[in-house]
Amino acid sequence: MKSIIDVKNLSFRYKESQEYYDVKDITFHVKRGEWLSIVGHNGSGKSTTVRLIDGLLEAESGEIVIDGQRLTEENIWNIRRQIGMVFQNPDNQFVGATVEDDVAFGLENQGLSRQEMQKRVEEALDLVGMLDFKKREPARLSGGQKQRVAIAGVVALRPAILILDEATSMLDPEGRRELIETVKGIRKDYDMTVISIRHDLEEVAMSDRVLVMKKGEIESTSSPRELFSRNDLDQIGLDDPFSNQLKHSLSQNGCDLPENYLTESELEDKLWELL
């Protein structure tokens, strides 16, 4: 499968006086239609990396190629049209007086007819389950609802790439699950490439591939299942998922399970087989 993002020997530091680099000589790719999770300790370079990809920061060295185009000052705005970002705090992204106004805001500079704009707004809100709230003020929404509206604003623009930068970290467990299910549906419906930054391995399990960052460098690249089999997750800033904890506890009590399980439902199915 062809890559939609190629990052080559990328380095960046916030201040030239720094002796260390916030991102140091990293190289990786993202395939078209892939879901890539980027994980690691706070300060490992995750958010800096996606901000470099989106052109919010300028690299000191190296190159970024988006869908065959090398990111430069000349084409940065055209490339940004292919990328949609959702941040940790949705309040920072709201500009409209109502939900539908906010989703429509990004479309106003694309030369679309009013009819096409209305169609896209309604389709995007329906896709994230927020169509009934289109006349609501954003301030009156819950955290999970705000994030879904933020995603709708991105989806309405039809980007090829969706970046979630800690987008679920302020939500409760139910809100996180709902948002991740929404993203799964969007990815399927629009064949969208997804990059997500998160510490929660239950969410990481949904991805195709995981890139682990440590001190500004790429520590490893693997599948979620390979990552879950590691015994040093705490050393790379990750909590052991509940399925792994339960498997370990059962093993200590004489019930050895042969595999690593990505989700609680996978483990549940296996336990039912053993009963």
Go through the PLM ranges and name each one.
Residues V39-H41:
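The feature captures the beta-strand-to-loop junction immediately N-terminal to the Walker
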Residues D54:
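Helix-to-loop junction immediately C-terminal to a conserved catalytic motif
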Residues G62-R70, I79:
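Conserved ABC transporter NBD signature motif
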Residues Q115-F133:
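Conserved ABC ATPase "signature" region
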Residues E137-L141, Q145:
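Conserved ABC ATPase signature
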Residues L162-D165:
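Catalytic Walker B motif of ABC-type/P-loop ATPase nucleotide-binding domains
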